Amino acid sequence: MRVGQLLRFRSTSLRSSTARQEYVPHHKPVVEDDIKRLEDFLLSKPNVLVLTGAGISTESGIPDYRSEGVGLYARSNHKPVQHMEFVKSSAVRKRYWARNFVGWPKFSATQPNATHHALARFEREERVQAVVTQNVDRLHTKAGSRNVVEVHGSGYVVKCLSCEYRIDRHEFQSILASLNPAFKDAPDMIRPDGDVEIPLEYIENFRIPECTQCGGDLKPEIVFFGDSVPRPRVDQIAGMVYNSDGLLVLGSSLLVFSGYRVVLQTKDLKLPVGIVNIGETRADHLADIKISAKCGDVIPKLFDFRNSKSVS
C-alpha cells in the first residue's frame, strides 16, 4: 500500500480564509471603543514592547495548544515532546523528526496575517520598540519586523546537541528527503512547532543524519517543554523591558512562565501593561487595559485614521 494512503487523517486546508479561521477560538466582535482605548494607551508610549503568543498565528492557520475546542489539546491526546525525552531517547528523536519532516512544507509555507503586518508597520513608524515572541514560526520576520526576539527559539534552525554546529531547516529538509524518499506526502494537521501525526509503522524506518562536525544528535533550535530559555536571552528581554515604557501582550494566555515573567518584570518597574487576547490570561489582574478579542479584529485597525509619524 502506498505511503500516501496510510498518511490520510483529519485534513484541513490553509488555502481559504475560512479554513484559517478554524483554529481561532470562539470570540465576540470587537467593540470599537476598545480600539480607541488601546490607541490612546499606545499613543503615550512610543517605546512600548510587544509580547506575542500562539494566538496571533492561529489566524495564519497554525493551531495553538490550549484554546478550548480548537487547540491541539482539544483535538488530540498527543502531548508535545519533552526536552529530556528527546535528548535521551533515539526512538523519540526518530518519531519527532519523522513527523516534523512531513509537516515542514506546510508549516514553512505559512504566511503572516494582518496582525503580523500591522506590527511590522508600527515598528517602521516607531510606535513600538520591538517584538518578543513566544512563537517559533518566524511569521514576524516574514512580515518585515526587524527587531524580534524569539523566546523559545525558531523552527527554522537545526542545531547539534554536542557542538556549535547549525544548519538551516530548509537545507536539513533536503537532507532528510534524500534519506527518506518514501515520505513524500505531507499531511495537513500542523502543531505549533511544525510537528504532525503519522502512522508509527513508518517512523521505524525513518533515517536521521548525524552532525557532520562531531556525529552528535540534531535538534531544532526550539526550547522544548521541560527545558529553560537560555539565560542570555532572558537577560536580553529583561533589558528590553527596562528600556521600554510599557508592554502590550497579544494572543497569549501567559500560562507559560517565560511569557508571564515579562509581565512581572514590567510591573516590577511600575510600567503599564495592555493585553489583547481571546479569553482570560494569567495576568489579567495586572493589566492596565484588557481587551478580550481576536487580535486581527483589533491590531490592524489601530492608527488607521491618524497620520503616520514621520520617520527620519
From Swiss-Prot:
Localization annotation: Mitochondrion matrix
Binding-site list for Zn(2+): C160, C163, C211, C214
GO molecular function: histone deacetylase activity; histone deacetylase activity, NAD-dependent; NAD+ binding; NAD+ poly-ADP-ribosyltransferase activity; NAD-dependent protein lysine deacetylase activity; zinc ion binding
Assigned keywords, A-Z: Metal-binding, Mitochondrion, NAD, Transferase, Transit peptide, Zinc
Top enzyme category: transferase
Positions in coiled-coil regions: none
Main location as per UniProt: mitochondrion
Highest rank taxon of the organism: Eukaryota
Co-factor requirement: Zn(2+)
Extent of the transit peptide: 1-16
Binding-site residues, NAD(+): 53-73, 134-137, 251-253, 277-279, 295
InterPro entries from the UniProt entry: DHS-like_NAD/FAD-binding_dom, NAD-dep_sirtuin_deacylases, Sirtuin, Sirtuin_cat_small_dom_sf, Sirtuin_class_II, Ssirtuin_cat_dom
GO cellular component: mitochondrial matrix; mitochondrion
PROSITE patterns documented for this protein: SIRTUIN
Reaction(s) catalysed by this chain's protein: N(6)-acetyl-L-lysyl-[protein] + NAD(+) + H2O = 2''-O-acetyl-ADP-D-ribose + nicotinamide + L-lysyl-[protein]
Active-site residue list: H152 (proton acceptor)
A Pfam family it matches: SIR2
Deacetylase sirtuin-type domain sequence ranges: 28-312
GO biological process, one term: determination of adult lifespan
Keyword set includes Oxidoreductase: no
Cofactor note: Binds 1 zinc ion per subunit.
EC number of this enzyme: 2.3.1.286
Its job: NAD-dependent protein deacylase. Catalyzes the NAD-dependent hydrolysis of acyl groups from lysine residues.
Record-stated family: Belongs to the sirtuin family. Class II subfamily.
Protein name: NAD-dependent protein deacylase Sirt4
